[in-house]
Amino acid sequence: MNTAFEQYLNFVKNFAQLHKKAAEIPLGESNPKIDSPKTGPKVMICSPHPDDECVVGALPLRMQQEMDAEISNLAVTLGSNEDRKKGRLAELEKACETLNFNLLLPGESALDGVNLTTKKSNPELWSENAAAIVDILKTELPEILFFPHDNDYNSTHIGVHFLMMEAIANVQNEKADWQPTIIETEFWHMMEKPNLMVAVSDEDEARLIYALSAHTGEVERNPYHVNHPARMLDNVTRGAEVVGSQGGEAPECNFAMIYRCSKMKNGIAVPAWDGGKIIGVNDDIKSAIFS
């Protein structure tokens, strides 16, 4: 057998073994939240489900660390399983504590029916959901909002996109000077024309997985938290081309997350810049994105 092939075979076997072993790491632990005043921008992650704050939270985490940003996770829904909502909320609280994120709910048990079927067949419920989001946006007036792109496959992810766009436009009708930056995320389906790739340190990737493991009811069923690094590895290769340029060099990092950054003006999303930006582990987030 070819020596080089044997080395690659060992690499694949070791990778698979290490991945399998990672699923045995204890779940559900958390760190207590550190309450301290923030001097940076207000950032809101609008999560379709509990766990999305971890899945797409790399850039918010860097904003917290590098810009002293106040990060709030708006749990738009607690999932569709009524029997799991209390449990998922408890898990979400632990995950947010670990990431030092605030937790906001639009109502006692968040929202239901956040999808385009509801928008078409039950416009009254859709309007009630939009009004609940509008109230929170008016109170918080975040400068930066994260939510899924409009084709992220999952019906609730897509619903959250359109609900947020509608709510932001409604607030801007009353507060024209509020022009937040929106940063669209991807999970279930890659987005068209992303314009931002953010490198993630090993420590931050571990922190995101650690927080994700607090969603015990979900990861016990399917240990997808240990798949997260593989996705982030793939982002480095893919992002070099789709955010950078075809034939572009991959940045010097192990992990990265891909986003699309725009400014909301008069209810319309306008790309924040021409082309794409790649931000390395040691690059300054504030100057790279907001200058």
Residue ranges, per PLM feature:
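C-terminal and late-domain segments of enzyme folds
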Residues: 222, 226-291
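Hydrophobic alpha-helical segments, principally membrane-spanning helices and signal/leader peptides
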Residues: 34-36, 186, 245
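Histidine- and/or cysteine-centered catalytic micro-motif in compact active-site loops
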Residues: 150-151, 187-188, 264
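A conserved mid-domain beta-alpha-beta active-site/ligand-binding segment of alpha/beta enzyme cores
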Residues: 189-249
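Conserved residues at beta->alpha junctions
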Residues: 47, 75, 187, 199-202
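Short, flexible loop segments at boundaries between secondary-structure elements
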Residues: 171-194, 199
